[in-house]
């Protein structure tokens, strides 16, 4: 049986540090686990250190746009001034309430200098831009805590500054990147052209890609060599409409397709782990069918595995 690939998954964001660092074992899946913020990064380090199957976990290091407001770039400012600078808001009351619960911002340069480990980290990610995300009332998104959404957003200019910094880290270390992109397809492509196009060792994974096929084929796959662009497909985004998912698969070179769950993996419950495995099996079956109805899922799984090895090396 061919090993399954989860090219983009997570651990839980846990500010209270109660995380147990248990993924229930690899479950026969090669996992590329993203970090998005300082809290899940601490948890991911624990998981990588405790894993009994270290060859099945690839570690990502990054700052997701949903958490980019937790960092400042350049000179330190007081807490209120920082959040005034990086947040976009019209409701002063909402802003004041958020500032009360948000932590003191961290120096992005110090964070990278202190935490980045070239030996441990395989991928720079998750990084990117998000035009739609609104901050929850508790200050930042946590998988296990439900909070109402405010109307406050992180300024795109700040998201871009953070994203560019991680692009430069990828250039410096020759690591691949995994990109989050919501309604910023052209902007992200422009930035990657500026920051990465001439750095041939940096590969790019467009995770759960939701842009147009025209942007994908006419920009990403036209300007970048096909061996540098990968598209990671998820069940709940790319195959929400199976026909659209099939059409996306057929439009792509078979050499650039990856599979993902985009779910936290640090829940050892067997039924939860089984559900993650079934998502990846579903994707392989859909990909195989889109290529050729005579193919079976194992053939797609083999190709995806080979693609991931090229992405990560």
From Swiss-Prot:
Gene3D superfamilies: Metal-dependent hydrolases
Residues given in the record as a divalent metal cation 2 binding sites: 126, 180, 207
Superkingdom as given in the UniProt entry: Eukaryota
InterPro entries, per database record: DNase_TatD-rel_CS, Metal_Hydrolase, Metallo-hydrolase/TatD-type, TatD-like
GO MF entry, a single one: nuclease activity
Residues where a divalent metal cation 1 binds: 8, 10, 126, 262
Free-text cofactor note: Binds 2 divalent metal cations per subunit.
Key words of the record: Hydrolase, Metal-binding, Nuclease
EC number: 3.1.21.-
Required co-factors: a divalent metal cation
Pfam families (alphabetical): TatD_DNase (PF01026)
General function of this protein: Putative deoxyribonuclease.
More info: Present with 125 molecules/cell in log phase SD medium.
Similarity comment text for this entry: Belongs to the metallo-dependent hydrolases superfamily. TatD-type hydrolase family.
Name used for this protein in its record: Uncharacterized deoxyribonuclease YMR262W
Native species: Saccharomyces cerevisiae (strain ATCC 204508 / S288c)
